[in-house]
Design a protein with these regions (language model features):
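Nucleotide-binding motor/catalytic cores of P-loop/tubulin-like NTPases across gene-expression machines
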Residues: 176-179, 184-187, 421-424, 428-430
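Terminal-region recognition feature
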Residues: 1-146, 152, 164-167, 171, ...
C-alpha cells in the first residue's frame, strides 16, 4: 500500500530491523509470552493480532550488528493491536533494556504505537513508570539510547520511552503526539489543529533532532554511535593526533603580534569570518546535528552537534554567527539548548566543546521574561561542576553574558582574533565616557584581546591566524581542528577527580 504524500511507507518491525542492521546479524531476545487470565473477547483479539502479524506481542527485542557494532534493539509492531503497550509487552521491553544495560550495549528503539492498551486498563498505563525507570538506569550507566519515532507514535509510548533518547529522529510525515486526534475530537467536540502532530513540526520546534527516511537510519545511527559510544575506545582513535605541528601554537608561545584591541574586535566582526559551521564541515568527522532543547524551544543562534576532532569524540555547543542578527539575537532558548548539550556530555561521559562567537545576548522584553539572566547563571553553574571534560574556544566575538555562559572550561583556547568583554566596546565606552567614540580605547583598557587573556591566565592557548581567519578560512579551520584533537586527547587522558579539582581552583583564583 502506498503512503500518503510526504509520508514514508509503513514497515513492520522485522522489515525495519532488517533494513537497519547488518545482514544475518539478528538474534532475538524474546521469551514466550506469559499472560494472566483475560476475557474471552480480549483473548480473541490477541489471537487475531498474532495471526495477522506472525508476532506474539507488540514489541520485538534482540541484538544485532550495525556497521559491525553490536547493538540492542527494541521495536514496536503496529499491526499487533495498534502497537499498544500492555503488561506483557512492557515486560518484554523492560527486560530488553535491562539486558542491554547489563551487557553494556547501545540501545536503539523504534516505537510505533497508539499508546497504552486500553483492554488492560490502569495496570497497563502504569507500565510507563517501569519502562522509564529501566531507560533511566541504562542512561545512568553511560550507555547510548537512540530513538526513531515511527508513524504513528502517541500516548504513553511517546510520554515514556519515545521521548528519552540522547538522539531522537523520526519518520517523514509521521503522526506523533500525546493525545490522538480521534480522542481529542470525541472529548472536545472539535478537530485537533492540522499539521501540529507531525514529525516535521516537532523538528521545527526543537522537540526532535531530525526527520530521517528509512534508508538513512543506519548511517545516522552509525555516525551518532561513533561519537556517543567512543569514550572507551578514544585512545585508539586519537593515535598520531597528540602532537600537531609546532606552527599551530602551544601554551608556551607568546601570542603577541602587535594587533591592537580594536583591530581584533574589527576582525572578529568580518562577515566572511569562518564560524562553527565552517569549522565542522572542514575539520570534524562523524558530525550529527542535534536540534533544540527537547522541550519545545529552538534557537538558530546555537548549534548543537556530536562530532570528532582528530578521532576524539565530543559534544559541540557552537554559537552560530550566521544564526544571530539584530532582529534575532541569542536568546534564553539558546542557553537552554546549550544546557541540553551539557547534560548529554555528562550522561555519556563525553568531552564538551563550546565555541563562543556572539555579538551579545538578546536585550528585549521576551528575553527578560524568558529568563535570560537565570539561564546564564545556570550555564555557569552547570559548566563549573560538570564531570565531563570541557574545552572552550573564543572563536570570534565574545560579548557579555551570552559569551561568558560558555567560558568556564577545563581548558580555554582563543583564536588570535577572538576576544572577551563584558559589553561591546562601544557599550563600555558609552558607560564610562558617554560616547561610543572611545570604543577602541576601552577595548584596550579592558584587556579583551586573546593575547591579554593569555597573559592574565584566562586563556591557555592562542591559535594563530595568518593574518586573519577570514583570509585563510580552510587553513584556519584545519589548524583549529588539529588543536582541538590534541586538546581533547589530553583532557580524556586526565583523572576526572584531579581535573575537576583543578578547574574549581582555577576559577576560584582568577584575577589573583
Amino acid at each position: 500500500m502506498s503512503a500518503p504524500s510526504g509520508r514514508s511507507p509503513r514497515l513492520d518491525a522485522p522489515a525495519l530491523r532488517d533494513l537497519v542492521l547488518d545482514p544475518g546479524s539478528w538474534l532475538s531476545w524474546d521469551s514466550p509470552i506469559v499472560r494472566g487470565e483475560v476475557s474471552e473477547e480480549y483473548a480473541a483479539e490477541l489471537a487475531r493480532a498474532a495471526e495477522q502479524t506472525s508476532q506474539d506481542e507488540a514489541i520485538i527485542s534482540g541484538e544485532g550488528r550495525l556497521r559491525g557494532r553490536r547493538v540492542a534493539v527494541v521495536a514496536g509492531e503496529f499491526g499487533f493491536l495498534a502497537g499498544s503497550i500492555g503488561v506483557a509487552a512492557a515486560e518484554r521491553l523492560i527486560a530488553a533494556v535491562e539486558r542491554a544495560t547489563d551487557e553494556g550495549l547501545p540501545l536503539l528503539a523504534a516505537p510505533v504505537s497508539g499508546g497504552t492498551r486500553m483492554q488492560e486498563g490502569t495496570v497497563a498505563f502504569l507500565q510507563m513508570i517501569g519502562i522509564t525507570a529501566a531507560i533511566a538506569r541504562h542512561k545512568e550507566a553511560g550507555l547510548p539510547y537512540l530513538v526513531y519515532l515511527r508513524n504513528p507514535t502517541f500516548g504513553g509510548v511517546l510520554a515514556s520511552w519515545g521521548s528519552l533518547g540522547h538522539v531522537t529522529i523520526a519518520e517523514p510525515g509521521a503522526s506523533i503526539g500525546f493525545l490522538g486526534a480521534r480522542v481529542y475530537q470525541a472529548l472536545y467536540g472539535e478537530p485537533f489543529p492540522q499539521d501540529v502532530q507531525t514529525a516535521e513540526n516537532l523538528a521545527e520546534h526543537g522537540l526532535i533532532d531530525a526527520v530521517v527516511p528509512h534508508e538513512e537510519i543506519a548511517d545516522v545511527a552509525d555516525r551518532a554511535l561513533r561519537v556517543l559510544a567512543a569514550r572507551s575506545t578514544w585512545h585508539l582513535d586519537v593515535r598520531g593526533t597528540e602532537h600537531p605541528p609546532a606552527e599551530d601554537g602551544t601554551d608556551a608561545d607568546d601570542p603577541e603580534d602587535g594587533r591592537s584591541a580594536w583591530d581584533v574586535v574589527t576582525a572578529s566582526r568580518r562577515e566572511d569570518r569562518p564560524g562553527v559551521r565552517r569549522l565542522l564541515r572542514t575539520a570534524a568527522t562523524d558530525v550529527v546535528g542535534l536540534s533544540g532543547t527537547g522541550a519545545g524551544e529552538r534557537d538558530p543562534g546555537l548549534l548543537l552537534a556530536l562530532a570528532r576532532f582528530g578521532g576524539a569524540p565530543c559534544v559541540v555547543l557552537g554559537q552560530d554567527r550566521r544564526g544571530q542578527s539584530m532582529s534575532a539575537p541569542l536568546g534564553p532558548a539558546a542557553l537552554r539548548e546549550a544546557r541540553r548539550g551539557m547534560r548529554l556530555a555528562e550522561e555519556l561521559r563525553l568531552p564538551l566543546v563550546t565555541l563562543i562567537d556572539t555579538p551579545g545576548a538578546a536585550l528585549s522584553r521576551e528575553a527578560e521574561e524568558g529568563g535570560l539572566a537565570g539561564e546564564i547563571a545556570r550555564c555557569l553553574h552547570d559548566l563549573v561542576v560538570l564531570r565531563a571534560p570541557t574545552l572552550a574556544v573564543l572563536l570570534g566575538q565574545g560579548t557579555g553574558g551570552g559569551a561568558l555562559a560558555l567560558v568556564p572550561a577545563d581548558r580555554v583556547l582563543a583564536a588570535a582574533n577572538g576576544w572577551l568583554g563584558p559589553l561591546p566596546p562601544e557599550g563600555a565606552s558609552a558607560i564610562v565616557h558617554r560616547t561610543v567614540d572611545r570604543a577602541g580605547e576601552m577595548a584596550a583598557k579592558q584587556g579583551v584581546r586573546a593575547t591579554d587573556l593569555w597573559r592574565a591566565g584566562i586563556v591557555d592557548r592562542v591559535v594563530p591566524e595568518r593574518p586573519d581567519a577570514a583570509d585563510e578560512p580552510t587553513e584556519f579551520c584545519l589548524r583549529l581542528g588539529r588543536v582541538l584533537g590534541e586538546e581533547l586527547a589530553g583532557l580524556l587522558g586526565r583523572d576526572d577527580t584531579e581535573r575537576i579539582r583543578t578547574r574549581l581552583h582555577r576559577y576560584r583564583h582568577l584575577g589573583h
